[in-house]
C-alpha cells in the first residue's frame, strides 16, 4: 500500500494505524458523525451579511422575501407597498439609493459563493420608483411629544434624521444654507444619475410629515448656535462636507484650478453650461467620474468672449452662462488622472467603463507634481509623474514627468467641512468626533451624523441619522444614559411583531411554576434570535440547494463620445416587475426559513412537520416533535438558509 508524503510524516502510526487505547474519533465529534445525539434542532435567526454590510441598516432579506412572495403583506396591502414600508423603516430614499448607492451589501452577499450576488440595488430601485409613481406617503401614529429638534443641514443625514424623529412624534426644523434641500444628493451628484423629480418626490414625503424648514439660513452666521440651544430641546448636526480640497501642489492657486464640489454645484445650480477645450480632473472616486462625465456632456464653445464666460468665473459665482450659447457646443477633451491604477480606483467599475466609452481618457498610477501657469497666471497644464511610496513618502520615478494640457483643472481629491461659526466642534482635523451613539461628548442634547463625522457614502449618512434619531428620542424621553448599540446595528426581522401582524399574538404569561412546555402560547418555542450579534457565513448554508441562475442585470444606456455631448438623460433602466421578482427569488434568505420543505422531506423520523396553515407566519413554517427527534442533525444539514441549528440540549 502506498502512502502519501503527509502520512509518511506521522511516525506514530504502525500497520495497525492506532496504538492500544487510542480512540479513532474524539468523543466530542460523535455528534457530527453518529446517527443520533443528545442535541435537537432549534430555529435560530441570524443576520445575513448583506444587512451587516449595509451602512443604512436596511432589512434587505426582509424586503427581498416580500418581493418574492414568502413574507406575505397584511390584508389589503400590495407586496410593492409592503416592500416599500420595510425598506423605508431604515432608508427614506429607496429610489435615489437604488440608483447611486455603490451597494456594499452586494459585495457581502453569500450568493457570491454560488455564482453572483443578488441584484439588491435593482430591486430597491424598482420599489422606490413604484412608490413615487403610486404616491406613497409616510404616516406617523406617534402622539406629538411637544419636543423640538433643530437639524443643521438638509442633506441625506439631516433629512433622514427629520424623517425618523417625525415618526417618533418630535417636531423638527431643518436649517440649510441652500435654496433647496438635498445636500450632496442635489448639489454633488448630477441629475442624469439622480433625476430631480425623483429626489424631490422622496424629499416631499418627509416634509409631508410636518417637518419645517429654514432655507438660505446658515447656522453660525444667519442664526447663532446659542439661539438653537435656547429654542430647541435637541440639535442634530449634519452640515455635510461640501467644500472641496484644493490640490496640494504649486500653482494650484490659479483661478482656473477649482474643486470638484464647486464645479458640481455650479453645474447642478444650472449656472455652468460649458467648459474649456481641455479639462483635467484629479481623483479616482465616484466624484471624479461625475466631474469628468459632466464635463464631457457640457463640452466647449469656441466662439465666445473668454473674459466674460470662462468656466472658473461661473464656478466662482461671478457670472452665469447664457443658455442660448449651448447650441454651438463642441466636444471637450477630458482626462481623469488618478494615483491609483485603473483597476484599483475607488469609483464604481461600471461608472469607469461608461466614462471610457464616452471618450474620457483615464491615466492611473501617476501623481500631480505641479500646475503649470501661463503668463497671465492661469493654468495651462498639469504636470504629473509616475511614483512609488517608500516608507509612507511619495517618491517620483526619474524621467516619467509629463504635462497634460488644460484650460480647466478640477481637484476631486476629497471634501472638507466648513466650520465657520461652529469652530468649537472642530476636532482639529476638520471633522466632529462623536461617541458610538453619535452624541457629542459632554453635550447630551447634541448629536451628529453624515460627512461631518467622515466623508463617506450617502447610505452611511442615512445610517448615522437612524442611530442618532434613536439616541435623540431616548434623550427627549428622559434617558440620560443611552443603551449600547448592538453588534449588528441594522433593522431586522422581528418575530414578535410578525406574530402580532399575522394575527397570532402571544398570550400573557400566567407566572405559574410548571415543567417545560412546547404547547403554551405565551412564548415562541425552540426559537432563538441571535440576529443582533451574529452574521451567518456561507459555510453554514447548504449551498448545494441553489442551482446556477444568472443575475437579472439592469440595462445601462451606453453613449460614445459624440452621443454624450449635450446628453443629460438618465442612463440606468429599470427592471420589469417579473425581472424584479425573479431576482428576489435568487436571495438565499441567509439565517431565516424560506419554506423550502427540505427538513420535512429528509427527516427520517418524521419529527419535523409543517405548522398548521392557520398558524403559519414567516419564521414559523415548521416545528419539531421532540418525542420523535433522535438528534441525527439531517434537518440542519439540508437547511439551505442555516436557520436550523443543532443547539437544543446543550
Enumerate the predicted regions with their spans:
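FAD-site-proximal beta/loop scaffold in flavoenzymes
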Residues: 255-279, 297-300, 306, 371, ...
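Beta1-alpha1 glycine-rich phosphate/pyrophosphate-binding loop at the start
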Residues: 25-27, 49-51, 58-75, 84, ...
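Glycine-rich dinucleotide-binding loop and its adjacent helix/turn
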Residues: 123-143, 201-221, 244-328, 427-443
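Conserved beta-strand-loop-beta-strand element in the redox core of flavoprotein oxidoreductases
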Residues: 215-235, 373-402, 619
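Generic beta-strand/beta-sheet core signal
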Residues: 152, 175-177, 216, 237-239, ...
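Ferredoxin-type iron-sulfur electron-transfer modules and their immediate structural context
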Residues: 1-148, 196, 235-253, 374-375, ...
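Extended, hydrophobic alpha-helical segments in both membrane/secreted and soluble proteins
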Residues: 156-161, 172, 243, 281, ...
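Flexible loop/turn segments at secondary-structure boundaries
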Residues: 181-182, 222-223, 243-246, 265-267, ...
Amino acid at each position: 500500500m502506498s502512502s502519501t508524503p503527509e502520512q509518511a510524516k506521522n511516525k506514530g502510526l504502525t500497520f495497525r494505524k492506532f496504538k492500544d487505547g487510542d480512540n479513532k474519533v474524539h468523543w466530542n465529534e460523535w455528534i457530527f458523525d453518529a446517527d443520533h445525539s443528545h442535541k435537537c434542532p432549534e430555529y435560530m435567526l441570524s443576520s445575513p451579511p448583506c444587512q451587516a454590510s449595509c451602512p443604512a441598516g436596511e432589512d434587505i432579506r426582509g424586503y427581498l422575501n416580500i418581493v418574492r412572495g414568502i413574507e406575505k403583506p397584511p390584508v389589503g396591502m400590495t407586496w410593492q407597498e409592503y416592500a416599500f414600508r420595510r425598506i423605508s423603516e431604515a432608508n427614506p430614499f429607496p429610489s435615489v439609493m437604488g440608483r447611486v448607492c455603490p451597494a456594499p451589501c452586494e459585495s457581502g452577499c453569500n450568493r457570491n459563493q454560488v455564482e453572483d450576488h443578488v441584484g439588491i440595488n435593482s430591486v430597491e430601485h424598482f420599489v422606490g420608483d413604484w412608490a413615487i409613481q403610486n404616491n406613497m406617503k409616510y404616516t406617523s401614529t406617534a402622539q406629538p411629544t411637544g419636543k423640538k429638534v433643530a437639524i443643521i443641514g438638509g442633506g441625506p443625514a439631516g433629512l433622514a434624521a427629520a424623517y425618523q424623529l417625525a415618526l417618533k412624534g418630535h417636531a423638527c426644523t431643518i436649517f440649510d444654507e441652500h435654496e433647496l434641500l438635498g445636500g450632496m444628493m442635489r448639489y454633488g451628484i448630477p441629475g442624469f444619475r439622480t433625476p430631480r423629480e425623483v429626489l424631490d418626490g422622496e424629499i416631499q414625503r418627509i416634509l409631508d410629515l410636518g417637518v419645517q424648514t429654514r432655507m438660505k439660513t446658515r447656522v453660525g452666521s444667519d442664526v447663532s448656535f446659542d439661539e438653537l440651544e435656547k429654542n430647541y430641546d435637541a440639535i442634530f448636526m449634519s452640515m455635510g462636507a461640501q467644500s472641496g480640497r484644493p490640490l496640494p501642489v504649486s500653482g494650484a492657486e490659479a483661478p482656473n484650478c477649482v474643486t470638484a464640489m464647486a464645479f458640481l454645484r455650479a453645474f447642478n445650480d444650472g449656472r455652468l453650461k460649458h467648459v474649456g477645450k481641455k479639462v483635467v480632473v484629479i481623483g479616482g472616486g465616484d466624484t471624479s467620474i461625475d466631474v469628468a462625465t459632466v464635463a464631457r456632456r457640457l463640452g466647449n464653445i469656441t466662439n465666445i468672449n473668454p473674459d466674460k464666460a470662462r468656466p472658473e468665473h461661473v464656478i466662482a459665482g461671478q457670472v452665469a452662462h447664457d443658455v442660448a450659447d449651448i447650441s454651438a457646443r463642441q466636444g471637450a477633451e477630458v482626462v481623469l488622472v488618478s494615483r491609483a491604477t485603473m483597476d484599483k480606483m475607488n469609483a464604481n467599475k461600471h461608472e469607469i467603463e461608461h466614462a471610457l466609452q464616452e471618450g474620457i481618457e483615464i491615466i492611473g498610477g501617476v501623481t500631480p507634481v505641479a500646475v503649470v501657469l501661463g503668463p497671465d497666471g492661469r493654468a495651462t497644464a498639469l504636470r504629473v509623474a509616475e511614483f512609488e511610496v517608500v516608507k509612507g513618502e511619495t517618491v517620483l520615478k526619474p524621467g516619467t514627468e509629463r504635462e497634460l494640457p488644460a484650460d480647466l483643472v478640477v481637484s476631486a481629491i476629497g471634501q472638507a467641512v466648513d466650520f465657520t461659526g461652529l469652530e468649537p466642534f472642530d476636532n482639529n482635523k476638520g471633522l466632529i468626533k462623536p461617541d458610538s451613539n453619535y452624541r457629542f461628548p459632554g453635550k447630551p442634547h447634541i448629536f451628529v451624523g453624515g460627512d461631518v463625522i467622515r466623508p463617506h457614502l450617502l447610505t452611511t449618512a442615512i445610517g448615522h441619522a437612524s442611530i442618532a434619531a434613536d439616541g435623540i428620542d431616548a434623550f427627549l424621553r428622559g434617558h440620560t444614559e443611552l443603551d449600547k448599540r448592538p453588534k449588528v446595528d441594522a433593522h431586522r426581522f422581528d418575530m414578535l411583531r410578525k406574530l402580532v401582524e399575522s394575527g397570532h399574538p402571544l398570550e400573557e404569561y400566567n407566572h405559574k411554576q410548571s415543567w417545560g412546555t412546547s404547547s403554551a402560547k405565551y412564548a415562541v418555542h425552540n426559537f432563538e434570535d441571535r440576529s443582533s450579534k451574529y452574521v451567518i457565513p456561507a459555510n453554514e448554508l447548504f449551498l448545494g440547494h441553489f442551482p446556477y441562475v444568472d443575475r437579472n442585470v439592469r440595462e445601462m444606456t451606453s453613449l460614445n463620445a459624440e452621443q454624450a455631448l449635450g446628453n443629460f438623460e438618465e442612463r440606468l433602466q429599470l427592471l420589469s416587475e417579473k425581472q424584479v421578482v425573479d431576482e428576489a427569488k435568487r436571495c438565499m434568505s441567509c439565517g431565516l426559513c424560506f419554506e423550502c420543505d427540505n427538513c420535512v422531506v429528509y427527516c427520517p423520523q418524521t419529527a419535523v412537520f409543517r405548522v398548521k396553515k392557520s398558524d403559519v407566519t414567516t419564521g414559523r413554517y415548521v416545528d419539531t416533535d421532540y418525542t420523535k427527534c433522535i438528534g441525527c442533525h439531517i434537518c440542519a444539514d439540508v437547511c439551505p438558509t442555516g436557520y436550523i441549528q443543532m443547539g437544543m440540549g446543550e
